[in-house]
């Protein structure tokens, strides 16, 4: 029953958030109240990190059926701790996917609201952020009128994850730093983001 309630809240939240980013706090609080919070359980943190490693940091998408099964299992298991964090991440990704599928731009207010919540909640539970949150937050801020905050987010992310190719790419795109460009074309010329943004 609990899984059904959480699933319903997730579906409801996506349709609500498509219209208004400010409604997220109310729905999220309901999801959080259903979640078992455990600062020592790293399953969700590790899933976020693995998603980053396989989908963003890797030269090419290295998502495997095994990882997808692991993610699905965590989402469907009512005993998964810190599920509220995983739901926020999935809401963000679903919103982006739905916008792309419909040929529309994602809602910047929604993206920023989700990532702000995910950032603060993840810090509260784990005391630190996985790299994927810095990247998604930078993307969210970049979609809205918060360009200076993008630079700050990327710089903070690079302090924690100096080898993060996606963060280096976003830093280069915002600063046009020649040393970063050289690093990317010398050390990561085949990375999908370097190629996507035509960094040469």
Q: What residue ranges belong to the model's regions?
A:
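Amphipathic alpha-helical repeat scaffolds of TPR domains
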Residues: 25-62, 66-105, 126-140, 165-171
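Alpha-solenoid helical repeat scaffolds
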Residues: 69-72, 119, 155, 189
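Canonical positions in the second alpha-helix
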Residues: 121-122, 157, 184
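Terminal, low-structured helical/coil segments at or just beyond the last alpha-helical repeat
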Residues: 128, 170-200
